[in-house]
Amino acid sequence: MGKSFANFMCKKDFHPASKSNIKKVWMAEQKISYDKKKQEELMQQYLKEQESYDNRLLMGDERVKNGLNFMYEAPPGVKKENKEKEETEGETEYKFEWQKGAPREKYAKDDMNIRDQPFGIQVRNVRCIKCHKWGHVNTDRECPLFGLSGINASSVPTDGSGPSMHPSELIAEMRNSGFALKRNVLGRNLTANDPSQDYVASDCEEDPEVEFLKSLTTKQKQKLLRKLDRLEKKKKKKKSDKKKKKLQKSKNKHKKRKNKSPSSSSSSSSSSSSSSSSSSSSSSSSETSDSSSESDNKEKKREKEKRKKKKKTKCSESKSSDCKEDKPKNMLYEELSSSHSDRGKAQEKLRFPKQESSGENSMWVHSASDRTSRSHRHSPEKKGSDRNRGIRSRSRSRAESSRRSRSRSPYRQKHREVRSRPHRSPSEEQKGRKGTRSHGEGDHRREHVR
């Protein structure tokens, strides 16, 4: 019941946690490390050969110069065999005594760092600093020099073959073996170039500035603080003035660019407005109004003066346009009235002999009819004048309203100006002519009836 899924899967051959797979991986790793060591040995051998070859060249050996050195040297395999024989003849050093006659595998023969467990006893791959023996540390009770300092350990009688217990020698041996003490333990025995050995000023020595400040009174300190505050304020003011100057320069450049554009547009608009249309004048006024909102007070005053002048010119133009529009109408009315009067005179000449034969009563009737006809003849002229007056009054009222609207909204100027213009189609003019003719013909018919 207590077995888990991992325990079940580790027994499978394909699972990486199985014992067979772990063993295979470990064996492969050991073989790779063995091959690497072989390659390193070959490289070291090659480097030694090169060094010897270079030394011989420096010494001036003729064999090396002629390239015949290979004939007088033994092959590399012979040297290895000789070394192995020497090692077997001499006593090899082992970490532990039980390793002397113990059998080992090929991959573990030359490697002394591999941990072994003979007879199930755990072997520690550790070396003591004091007695230089493997299997324990200087803090273990197994060490014969346990509980003794370096000086006392050096005074203990030991064999001549044993290592010395002097602390400097111990530190050197530790470094050679790959160990090192902490800096806190070493203390002052370090070199003079070490940064921890630099000269540090004591607390008693104080800076001259601090001493000067301590010697001052409270009033003098307050004065110093005030001076420092003033200097800081001056620096801040200088910075703010520089920023303001930069902003003013940028604004002036921007204004100059904008003033150039509306001046050119206003000149073009004035030339076009004097020629034909009032729409160009409205566009120039809108441009000036936009530029005045962004410019300063001085520019606003100048633009106001320009506006007044333009308004005067516009009023004169509108009046002249109204007069021009009214002139052709008046001419038409005068022509119509003159034509009607000529016709009436011709008809009267034909009727005079008939009227003389008739009595005095008919004379009185003709005189009355002449008065009525004259009144009717003069009536269209009066009507035309009345119409012209009404049109002029309307155009003036609309012009005033358009001026007010321009000051308020420049975008509706065009629409209102188009409305203010009194346009009449040719059909309407023909109707007006027919109406005047019908009035004249009606008068003549009445005369004939009478």
Curated annotation (Swiss-Prot):
Phosphorylated by NEK6. GO terms for biological process: in utero embryonic development; mRNA processing; negative regulation of DNA-templated transcription; negative regulation of transcription by RNA polymerase II; positive regulation of transcription by RNA polymerase II; RNA splicing. Residues 314-329, 340-354, 425-450 have a biased composition (Basic and acidic residues). Keywords: Cytoplasm, Cytoskeleton, Isopeptide bond, mRNA processing, mRNA splicing, Nucleus, Phosphoprotein, Repressor, Transcription, Transcription regulation, Ubl conjugation. Residues 261-294 have a biased composition (Low complexity). This is Corepressor interacting with RBPJ 1. The modification Phosphoserine is found at residue 202. GO terms for molecular function: histone deacetylase binding; protein kinase binding; protein-containing complex binding; transcription corepressor activity. Residues 204-232 are annotated as: Interaction with RP9. The lineage of its organism: Eukaryota, Metazoa, Chordata, Craniata, Vertebrata. There is a cross-link at residues 79, 354 (Glycyl lysine isopeptide (Lys-Gly) (interchain with G-Cter in SUMO2)). One of its GO terms (cellular component) is centrosome. Regulates transcription and acts as a corepressor for RBPJ. Recruits RBPJ to the Sin3-histone deacetylase complex (HDAC). Required for RBPJ-mediated repression of transcription. May modulate splice site selection during alternative splicing of pre-mRNAs. It comes from Mus musculus. Interacts with RP9, SNW1, SFRS1, SFRS2,U2AF1, RBPJ, SAP30, HDAC2 NKAP and NEK6. Interacts with Epstein-Barr virus RPMS1. Component of the histone deacetylase complex. Component of the Notch corepressor complex. Interacts with NKAPL. A motif (Nuclear localization signal) lies at residues 235-247, 307-314. Residues 233-260, 303-313, 404-424 have a biased composition (Basic residues). Pfam families: Cir_N. Residues 1-121 are annotated as: Interaction with RBPJ. The keyword Glycoprotein does not apply. InterPro entries: CIR1, CIR_N_dom. It is found in: Nucleus speckle; Cytoplasm, Cytoskeleton, Microtubule organizing center, Centrosome. Residues 218-450 are annotated as: Disordered.
